[in-house]
């Protein structure tokens, strides 16, 4: 369970990064606040003829480096604080990847499991009508997130085009779309594919002779967890010895087959009881003696309580915020190489950027081209962060913040928004 206010955590992380760089007080004060917060009311006609009123948000955190970019979350416990924090993190994520974007995030307080498809469509279109004036391919570009998907993006794009009375490049108004209407190849696997490149480079800086035969444990078997298991085993020859979902995990020292585990999970609702594997708890998975640990589920799973028991040499944060600030210190002292979340999982937003570029230019790339360009972007970002960490003798998360905040600060200086 998340105990701290998400936006307070985001501000604390920013303040901590500021200690390792030269930044004016006024700029820091500016960066602690979103540039725009919009709250909207969305009336939706339900299938029974009644009207239900929903609350939605869109936060545009900082647009010094370009149009704001970030997903739209549908969650029964959505809060403005969470949306603000995620918009701040998107600002740093796009900056660390050196994408020409700022950071944004959207959310609607709703339990989508209680809505029919027709009700979901009406809610999606209603949200776009409500935020139409503040989004565009050149101002703020939404994408899928928690409980939203390509179908919802398609309805949203269609509504935007209907109001705007124009077609392409309005395609670029939203990313994460179905392939039939301007989506990009490689988007499904993007988060895991990007993470795999950072794990590969982390192994190099640790002096490993490749990843073949090395072991990995993955907490979380959703989209990112499954693709990471598949990519690390099939493309890099790693042994995926453990995976888990919210109900528990499985362990097999000889390795697990990603596709077979996925099939089992779909048929039985969980990876648990997979033939030939031993059931383990999520807590046990985190403390396994493996080469790489990839938390790919929820936030705050490695804390000061269990950080001392982590045995992996590399912790690849595929999830958002899986390691608490106190645990960061412990892992750093233990000499564990951490790949911080907004670097490790930035493959998703990077391929979203590629999708937008393809929409704007009207020229579409092959899967090989998408992967090759993603590899270049992720590898450069990894070394930007790693070299900063080495140079300043700070851990990777602080270094990622320093790289990102410095880039946003420079853009603000160049625009004349703040002074040195």
UniProtKB/Swiss-Prot annotation:
SMART domains according to UniProt: ELFV_dehydrog
PROSITE patterns linked to this entry: GLFV_DEHYDROGENASE (PS00074)
Binding site for NAD(+): 220-226
Catalytic activity: L-glutamate + NAD(+) + H2O = 2-oxoglutarate + NH4(+) + NADH + H(+); L-glutamate + NADP(+) + H2O = 2-oxoglutarate + NH4(+) + NADPH + H(+)
Keywords carried by this UniProt record: Cytoplasm, NAD, NADP, Oxidoreductase
Active site feature: 105
Main subcellular location: cytoplasm
Intrachain S-S bonds: none
Location of the protein in the cell: Cytoplasm
PANTHER family with a match to the protein in the record: GLUTAMATE DEHYDROGENASE (PTHR11606), GLUTAMATE DEHYDROGENASE 1, MITOCHONDRIAL (PTHR11606:SF13)
Protein name: Glutamate dehydrogenase
Organism, as annotated: Pyrococcus horikoshii
Gene name, Swiss-Prot/TrEMBL: gdhA
